[in-house]
Amino acid sequence: MTDDPKATASGIHPSPAEFTPEQLQADPILRFFHYAHLPLPLQPASRPFCELARHIVATLPRNAERTVALRKLLEAKDAAVRANVP
């Protein structure tokens, strides 16, 4: 376990810096949109999805369709990042 205050309880990698603890508590799926932990060449592929996730939670009412939108956005983000892995 690391002494880094940004590390998760599991110590696997740092907690998302892109969202506040309050945002993560309200919408746990947001933890999957962070990108600061990725290697620099992969961050540009992930960053726009993080920004769009932030826009979605800021502008859409919390309901089942918003959850579906975030889940599908996460699928797209994962594919975009994997497309850039050599």
Per-range role (PLM):
Residues 64-86:
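Short, compact, well-ordered microdomains
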Residues 2-65, 85-86:
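Intrinsically disordered, low-complexity regulatory regions
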